[in-house]
Amino acid sequence: MNDLLIRFWRWFEIAPEQYSIEGAPQIYGHEEDDFPYFDQLLMCAQKIVDDNDLTEGAISDLLTVMAIDNESESVSEYIQENSSPKQLEQIVKIGIEHMQFNARWQLSEIIINRKPKGYFFYLDRLCHDDHPYVSSRAKSCMERVRNKTN
């Protein structure tokens, strides 16, 4: 997976650190899913979820691919539908601090749909995220949670 991610960053002509701040620049004339090995990235992400013994590095790679796949959200959906409660808790714990904002905002949706242990705490943390898009999406999710409980 790491080799594929390195190839992606070279192909997209952006450093992961820059992508974590700006997302996809509109000037390049291509989207993330135009990457020739995009389907392989998605398959690797699914394989990580299917693995029962997640490492911190594997989760970080999974979250990076989820960020890259932020338009179709297929990685996010796969996590929601296929991760065990234990895996989901690991993903969320690491994910709320992950460098890619496009992964963090998707976690808000995963959190309210699956409600892992301590979900309100994680959602609250995302509501106070430094990135405005993450905090906006998390606040929207928080409002949906509050409306369901009233």
Residue ranges of predicted features:
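Charged linear interaction tracts used for macromolecular binding and regulation
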Residues: 97-99, 109, 113
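Residue-level detector of extended alpha-helical repeat arrays and alpha-solenoid scaffolds
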Residues: 59, 72-75, 104, 135
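Alpha-solenoid repeat junctions
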Residues: 67-70, 80-84, 111-115, 142-146
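Alpha-solenoid helical repeat scaffolds
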Residues: 74, 91, 106, 122, ...
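Amphipathic alpha-helical scaffolding segments comprising HEAT/armadillo-like alpha-solenoid repeats
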Residues: 50-62, 83-97, 116-128, 148-150
